[in-house]
Amino acid sequence: MLAVSLRDHGFPSATVQIRPAFCVQSDVVGSGNPPRMNYCQNARTAMSAALQSSDDAFRTVSSPLATDLDLSSPLEFFLRHRLTVVEELWEVVLRQECGQELVDILTQLRDLTSPEGQAPEVGGEALVQVIETLELSDAIRAARAFALYFQLINIVEQHYEQTQYQLAYERSRLEPLPGPDESPEGLHTIEIPQHQLDPFAAVIPLNQDPATFQTLFPRLRQLNVPPQMIQELTDRLDIRLVFTAHPTEIVRHTIRDKQRRIAYLLRQLDELETGKNRGFRELEAQNIRQQLTEEIRLWWRTDELHQFKPTVLDEVDYALHYFQEVLFEAIPLLYQRFRLALQGTFPDLQPPRYNFCQFGSWVGSDRDGNPSVTSAVTWQTACYQRSLVLDRYITAVEHLRNVLSLSMHWSEVLPELLSSLEQESMLFPETYEQLAVRYRQEPYRLKLSYILERLHNTRDRNTRLQQQQEKDPTTPLPEYRDGTLYQAGTAFLEDLKLIQHNLKQTGLSCYELEKLICQVEIFGFNLVHLDIRQESSRHSDAINEICEYLQILPQPYNELSEAERTAWLVQELKTRRPLVPARMPFSESTREIIETLRMVKQLQEEFGEAACQTYIISMSRELSDLLEVLLLAKEVGLYDPVTGKSSLQVIPLFETVEDLQNAPRVMTALFELPFYTQLNPTQSEPLQEVMLGYSDSNKDSGFLSSNWEIHKAQKALGTVARDHRVKLRIFHGRGGSVGRGGGPAYEAILAQPGRTTDGRIKITEQGEVLASKYALPELALYNLETITTAVIQSSLLGSGFDDIEPWNQIMEELAARSRRHYRALVYEQPDLVDFFNQVTPIEEISKLQISSRPARRKTGKRDLGSLRAIPWVFSWTQSRFLLPSWYGVGTALQEFLQERPEQNLNLLRYFYEKWPFFRMVISKVEMTLAKVDLQIAHHYVHELANPEDQERFERVFSQIAAEFQLTCHLVLTITNHGRLLDGDPELQRSVQLRNGTIVPLGFLQVALLKRLRQYRQQTETTGLMRSRYSKGELLRGALLTINGIAAGMRNTG
């Protein structure tokens, strides 16, 4: 036993005893048979042996912790201590609100799980019996309590992550910078022929990834990267993050506000407990603990769930909440840290432009499969965004007017500022009359007053635009004199820079002014750029209907071959002749397509092109899919064939494996159209954005195949773009879960083919992960900084491994084998659809009031093809299978290893150590496997399957369990880990922390789903209801368990 004193780390006198970790020795690969495991319990038990359930760990600080984490770290002890405090507060609140009886029920439920935090083996009746006999009210309270527990744990972990980042940032800032000749520790020279590598890939850091600016730039200097290359990359750096709504994000604003207040109180408590003279501040600490208790009690008495189906505008409000609360203030700090770190290492280099990192949004503009998103809704969204950002600017300028109180008695003023004041006195005579005397010697205050008038007028016009759309679009808007409002953020920026220039010329600077200029550069007057998205067949159907009405084709458009469609579309794109009559005698679907494009044109005229200039075509398959949108854009004036200019960027979204494979051919055909690359007059060199979808390709072919096809598509698209001298920006449609491309963004970006990044990237930020990334300022900064540093690294230090053809051939074989095995289960196993519908909560999820978007596409079918990727992944996650994120990987690896056991194992281990792409894939699979619990998954099968289906469903489950066992074994073998997640102790701790509580919550979900389905069967067959509970009560209980498991897993769909 190893004893560590807590007193050394600022905690009460106590000792933690650390047991040596129990390790599993993987059998040598080559026999073809993995060791026998009970659903990989050896691996899971080994991981759990390192970390006992949170209950035992937190009861007393003197209890032994079976962990090999670095408990010599004060920060780790700090986390343990804080978790203890929060769990104690949780129990206190439940005891106060519900009595000791509920606390006893929760304790009993958690105690009935295995010591490793796993579900007990099916057949152990104790836990099931307790759950089944619970009254519905007790079951709902238990579900709420567990959900609250997870939310509190998430807050503590976010707080811990933020503290980690702050400490790491301060440490890196204070450490002396190494000289250019000093060799960094942990660098290893890889002997690979130089022609296979990028110029600086010979030196690869094996530890301390430079995920912050303070670490990155010294590392680049150590590697002798030419400053000119860094400057060129910095000048073109273009990072875009696009917020999306999410069907599984069901946490209310009200709850988010409470979470933020609790995080603030925890930060105050930290300052008191870790500062000096703690004994004298104990009373203050007790007061904060009392406030925490009150906040948690208020939270307990608040509805976690929406009482109505959220509208699209509700989702807009939710997404923009993060800009209001965090991002608007955080983004200038990102620029400041970049500038200071760059110039601290390379003092002669210039920082990037302020808006190197920008934001977009699909919320309120993504109409793919969501009939609730109309042209009117998108217009309202744009007006709302504009209103929010104008409010922030008005507040900032009012503050600046107080700060810039410089008097002409004591400070010089340049003639150009005085000249602008004279002109504005004529534009705003009333303001001049009111303020000229008051500010006669304070020109900056007078200038800022005129700026405020313009901002107020701009906001007033925006409000009237929004009201006009809501009430009567024909109502005329009030007229404003030229120059009395801002048409765009550029004019506002010119006024601010005039003040900045005057201050600079007189030897002054103002941080608040610099910050506001940075914010205006980034957010403009639109806050975020709106992307329109629509499914490709909607455009084909619209053009088909238009052509049928006009009788201009010898046969229906949809019956033409691809070559015939393309030829006709190209011909139509050469003329201004309109196709669409003003009155539009078409179906609602076709009218909506045209009205959307007309609304985009109106938005651009009113708010500028940047407000909305991207049109994404989902399920893009052929060249005609892109030309159809361009033709419809021509009809509303977004493209002019005579000038050859377009204000709309047409973006293909390739989603399925087949479409990813065809993407290079489609883009080649597009770039070879003479008129196409000349569409955007603002670009010195044409820029094309291409979006790659992770969700549908994963659902189509499995995790390994999807990731490899996307990787290949990026390389091929990069080659096509370079051959045609077109700049390429890849738009990664990543979800929150691994099964939809989720996972750490830093590792994912480093795993991209380096030459395809080239300083440009666009990534979706899914609604379900927004809170984990942007709820706290330092977390938001860290997320943005890691993305930025990863883009710089990937662009400058590409590994070159992606170009080693024999490795690519091996990955091609692994992907094909994985795809075959995955599709054999998902699409060829005849019982899988029934299995999925019965043993996961998919039907209940589809009916829940948690999103404005339907769970299925409108095909009239209820097969897997019509099911969207999000509920597909969500359902597997809730039932603890997490199947889309790992199934098929084990078989692919095993078949490869059986060919040459020892040699191929060594090769895969080398891949894992050196190849960022392969390491990323295996790491994501390992993380997912650690979250799987097939014991409780089997409970879903046992309890929710119809009796007549039990036998065939058991066969399906056995097939899944065998693949899980195999995948666990081979991942551990390749990584040389004794337990899952040995390479990431913090994630390992986080997963284990939750396991003991997710298990009873899963059992509660099964019991509630069982009652809900029995209720439905009774009413459908007899028309009578024999349950004591209403359908609404049962559905509410089920939703609470979904909410709790989602919080516990920290990602869902």
From Swiss-Prot:
It is an enzyme of class 4 (lyase). Its cofactor is Mg(2+). One of its GO terms (biological process) is tricarboxylic acid cycle. Residues 461-473 have a biased composition (Basic and acidic residues). One of its GO terms (molecular function) is phosphoenolpyruvate carboxylase activity. It holds the Pfam family PEPcase. The active site is at H246, K699. Keywords: Carbon dioxide fixation, Lyase, Magnesium. GO terms for cellular component: cytosol. It catalyses: oxaloacetate + phosphate = phosphoenolpyruvate + hydrogencarbonate. Residues 461-480 are annotated as: Disordered. Its EC number is 4.1.1.31. Forms oxaloacetate, a four-carbon dicarboxylic acid source for the tricarboxylic acid cycle. Belongs to the PEPCase type 1 family. This is Phosphoenolpyruvate carboxylase. It comes from Synechococcus sp. (strain ATCC 27144 / PCC 6301 / SAUG 1402/1). The lineage of its organism: Bacteria, Bacillati, Cyanobacteriota, Cyanophyceae, Synechococcales.
